[in-house]
Amino acid sequence: AKAELQFDDFAAPLINDKEAADEADIIARRILPAEDIIHDREKSLGADDFADFLAVTKGVYTFIGTHNPDNPDTGAAHHNGHFDIDEKAMLISCNLYVDYAIAYLNGEFNK
């Protein structure tokens, strides 16, 4: 048997800018207890086109947990027909991104 294989590289590796990650950590610590902030998340083979943005500008990609142990229906992974987000997690992510933007625009991270 013969086969031809064409491999298309669809996404660049997603690597956070260290400075932006440190800034996001400052903001996250204002919103969440330190024990709820994970810095050494296991590497993933998943892909995201956000990597294309990080190739040209400083930025940070975060994971916000959406599982509530008190509600087992929220335990399914994303892109799963049973996925049901704990809407409280949306408040955390909104606060993180809005507070980061405000701090940035107010010059808090200027060195």
Cite the ranges covered by each PLM segment:
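Metal-dependent amide/peptide-bond hydrolase catalytic core
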Residues: 1-111
